[in-house]
């Protein structure tokens, strides 16, 4: 990892937790040592964004797990970036594979959400990644480049974007991409940014890895030159998240 890229660890709590056990988790995180050279962001369920922001130490930022592409309107069940900011959160996760595959979100919709969230001043954790059949068919590159292009077409300022590579076959399955597999894709993604956006953006943009990251797997993954952090699912609800935050130490 280039020294200019601050290590980034996101915890995606997904649809988990209640105030009591999330409060306990927050207590653990508040007591934890967060290295000065590491940025930490937690993404609670929407109903708990306010709760998490009030309870979490200011050293840990808060993200929403999703948002819509417009400011207000007749969109029952949706939330806007403006609402997310009003609750004190500063980031949003967009394009997560569960949004793509469980809820049928298209590349186009995700691109529109990215553009609107950035325009409203949120940081965006933009997720991309291939399914198992796509990896086995040898089209990983094609899939992740196409997804990245739609995101890139909607970004004016890359300083507020973190790219999260999440091989779908490794999410919640216990299968982790090997450090070498992760590095290979991250390196290719950085190459794509260099060729299609700019050398400066390629060097400064953080590309993080997601997919069954645990306290046991994080150190070797973090040692790869193009792995700039993690987006952590299940393990972010456990005390081992503190170990992952300290993966570079």
Curated annotation (Swiss-Prot):
Pathway of action: Carbohydrate degradation; glycolysis; D-glyceraldehyde 3-phosphate from glycerone phosphate: step 1/1; Carbohydrate biosynthesis; gluconeogenesis
Protein name listed in UniProt: Triosephosphate isomerase
Subcellular location: Cytoplasm
EC numbers, comma separated: 5.3.1.1, 4.2.3.3
NCBIfam families: tim
UniProt entry keywords in alphabetical sequence: Acetylation, Cytoplasm, Gluconeogenesis, Glycolysis, Isomerase, Isopeptide bond, Lyase, Methylation, Nitration, Phosphoprotein, Ubl conjugation
Entry-linked CDD domains: TIM (cd00311)
GO biological process: gluconeogenesis; glyceraldehyde-3-phosphate biosynthetic process; glycerol catabolic process; glycolytic process; methylglyoxal biosynthetic process
Organism: Macaca mulatta (Rhesus macaque)
N6-succinyllysine found at: 149, 156, 194
GO molecular function per UniProt: methylglyoxal synthase activity; protein homodimerization activity; triose-phosphate isomerase activity
Catalytic activity: dihydroxyacetone phosphate = methylglyoxal + phosphate; D-glyceraldehyde 3-phosphate = dihydroxyacetone phosphate
Modified residues (Phosphoserine): 80, 106, 159, 198, 212, 223
């Amino acid at each position: 990892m280039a020294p200019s890229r601050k290590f980034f660890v996101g915890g995606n709590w997904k649809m988990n937790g209640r105030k009591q056990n999330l409060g306990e988790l927050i207590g653990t995180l508040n007591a934890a040592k967060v290295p000065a050279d590491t940025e930490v962001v937690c993404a609670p369920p929407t109903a708990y964004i306010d709760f998490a922001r009030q309870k979490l130490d200011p050293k840990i930022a808060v993200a929403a797990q999703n948002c819509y592409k417009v400011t207000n309107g007749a969109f029952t069940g949706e939330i806007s970036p403006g609402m997310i900011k009003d609750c004190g959160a500063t980031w949003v996760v967009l394009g997560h594979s569960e949004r793509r595959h469980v809820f049928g979100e298209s590349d186009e919709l995700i691109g529109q959400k990215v553009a609107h969230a950035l325009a409203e001043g949120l940081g965006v954790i933009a997720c991309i990644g291939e399914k198992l059949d796509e990896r086995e068919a040898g089209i990983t590159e094609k899939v992740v480049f196409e997804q990245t292009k739609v995101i890139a077409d909607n970004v004016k300022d890359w300083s507020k974007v973190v790219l999260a590579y999440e091989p779908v076959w490794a999410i919640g399955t216990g299968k982790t991409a090997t450090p070498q597999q992760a590095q290979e894709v991250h390196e290719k993604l950085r190459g794509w940014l260099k060729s299609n956006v700019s050398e400066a953006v390629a060097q400064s943009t953080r590309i993080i890895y997601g997919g069954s990251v645990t306290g046991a797997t994080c150190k070797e993954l973090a040692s790869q030159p193009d792995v700039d952090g993690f987006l952590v699912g299940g393990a972010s609800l456990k005390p081992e998240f503190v170990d992952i935050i300290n993966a570079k130490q």
